[in-house]
Regions:
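Alpha-helical interaction scaffolds
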Residues: 1-261
């Protein structure tokens, strides 16, 4: 109960203070079931509060690095259990909390069921964001994140278009690090695969537009400087329009200046 209460109070502003309290309680845990339940709770919170997935990723990294569990546990037990549960929820079609809740939805009407299904999709999307932030914070390796990307491309497509949405969520968050760390061949193969998927006849226009964001992201690197924060595609297009406008004015001005020379 104390751990759940502290998790509910966790904010970016209070991160250091609350996370220290959480770690102090974890250090006193003697039961593996209690530890498992707490890890489930963190993952569920991260899935539900997906806007704060970076904060929950940093919490788990801090716990894995600084907590000192009882000697009855094997070394790095928190990290091992946490990553195993993250892997399960990533690979499976639905996170554990959705699977657990779904049997209770049998008697819901159409609109209530639609709300629950939307919540289920948001939980999955939240988990993808958590995985992305674990990679950004170096808890997952380049090799693992490449496996995650290929999981959605090779194993899921075109069974469920939602998986391509989750792929886009993942890549948009990690793209800058992915571009710097992964081998150039991996990047070229990835974007070639995306291009082939977009050109296929089995996708809806909606999904093709979402995937096109990844194409634009790849092409926009010619515009974004490495030291700058990644630009939104809308801002990139605005910048392109401005640059084209400036160039047009310059050409027009040069033509007139030559006439008066």
């Amino acid at each position: 109960k104390n751990l759940k209460s502290l998790l509910n109070k966790l904010t970016i502003e209070k991160f250091d203070k609350i996370s220290d309290k959480i770690i102090n309680i974890i250090n006193d845990i003697l039961n593996l079931d209690v530890l498992n339940n707490f890890i489930d709770l963190i993952i569920q919170k991260a899935q539900f509060d997906s806007n704060f997935s970076d904060m929950y990723a940093k919490l788990c990294i801090k716990i894995s690095k600084t907590c000192k569990l009882n000697n009855t546990f094997e070394p790095n037990i928190f990290k091992k259990l946490f990553l195993l549960k993250c892997q399960d929820d990533f690979i499976n079609d639905e996170p554990l909390q959705v699977k657990t809740a779904r049997p209770k939805w049998k008697n819901l009407d159409k609109y209530e069921l639609e709300d629950k299904n939307n919540w289920a999709k948001e939980c999955k999307k939240g988990h993808v964001k958590l995985v992305a932030n674990l990679y950004l914070n170096n808890m997952l390796s380049d090799k693992v994140i490449l496996i995650c990307i290929n999981h959605y491309i090779k194993n899921q497509y075109p069974k469920d278009e939602n998986n391509l949405i989750y792929l886009c969520e993942l890549v948009k968050i990690i793209y800058n690090k992915m571009k710097q760390n992964l081998h150039q061949n991996d990047m070229v193969n990835f974007i070639d695969t995306i291009n082939k998927i977009i050109e296929s006849d089995v996708l809806t226009c909606r999904i093709k537009f979402i995937l096109k964001d990844l194409q634009d992201l790849y092409l926009s690197n010619k515009i974004c400087n490495k030291d700058e924060k990644p630009m939104k595609l809308k801002d990139i297009r605005i910048q392109l329009i401005k640059e084209n406008s400036k160039n047009s004015k310059k050409i027009y001005s040069d033509k007139w200046s030559k006439k008066f020379q």
